[in-house]
């Protein structure tokens, strides 16, 4: 495809290589060994990629990267690693400052890398790609941006959440599918049957769970509240936070949430829905993939619907998976060219198709592609415009992700539900924790 970056801003690599070869032809090799070999030696890029739990998609992208290398005369050293493999390697890289040339960057590390100045600016690439397919979705465009409008990464795909509902249970009670969070509570009470090990709502609230942060934050935005303000300062102390805590507590007190909910990890609500002990829960497409491949009977009893709305609208806290180029690279221009190539729509399309719906598009018009017209997948695609990064309504900063990783919202919720604290006391503790994370990064 044709790219739109200005040639005056970056000379294409092939021209640079050609010029180098012409110069080398006119200049005698320096004394000593290796003069001729050095002039023709291929540049090499070390690239770290992450597994996506969809091997076909991983293979598709690996092939794209290798094909780009062959076409541009670049040696590719590509390592695609699981989370367990990546964690120690990233720890070593951070400690030694010996980074790959470019990589899929861990979400918690991206803002820190930006703050520490170890990434190459990607604004030019982002501007070029943003001209394609209707431009990036709002969340994808903002995920690696700083307050000065500069970009430091390029998005590859996103994830969002939907609501899974036991429509057969609702039909037994003559109830319509929920549109709002108030509907969720009403329905949960109607279908609740704890004597037979069935609870109306599989609400995520476990402190070892990232899903708990996603769920609470999505509901908080829907109720008109926010964890952080536009400038990245704590904003949890609000009437909207108190309203939401009261709402969830009413569900907890009514017994419509499984009593072991506070102990759930990220797989807790998946297991609860898949074992048919809850009537509703939020999740990514992972439950859908399980039902389609492992439990057709439960799939037929399930409705996949958008996240319920609150007084302020419909929101979900999602993730935007980013790649970046490290300033330690000897070939930053090559890395930027590679990212512009593999994250253009014509390369992402086969990657998404190979993923079978696991990865959601980062371009607006790609949400209209045929693969997203399947009814269940379409619900996922339709939630993308409602998906926001963790720092919403501002930018996602290092302190915001530190607080996220510390499960600050889930801890606050459990203070109220499990420990019996008042809203004011729980909010005060959470606000102090948020302020601590904020202050640490201002020093």
What are these regions (language model features)?
Residues 2-6, 18, 26-118, 126-134, ...:
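Conserved N-terminal structural module of periplasmic/extracytoplasmic solute-binding proteins
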Residues 39, 107-161, 176, 185, ...:
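Hinge/lid segment of periplasmic solute-binding proteins
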Residues 46, 66-72, 150, 169-173, ...:
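Extracytoplasmic/periplasmic substrate-recognition and gating elements
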Residues 58-62, 84-121, 133-153, 163-164, ...:
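Pocket-flanking alpha-helical
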Residues 123-136, 205-208, 223-243, 293-300, ...:
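Short, solvent-exposed loop/beta-turn-alpha elements that line the ligand-binding surface or hinge
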Residues 302-305, 353-407, 415, 443:
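Long, aromatic- and glycine/proline-rich binding clefts that accommodate carbohydrate-like moieties
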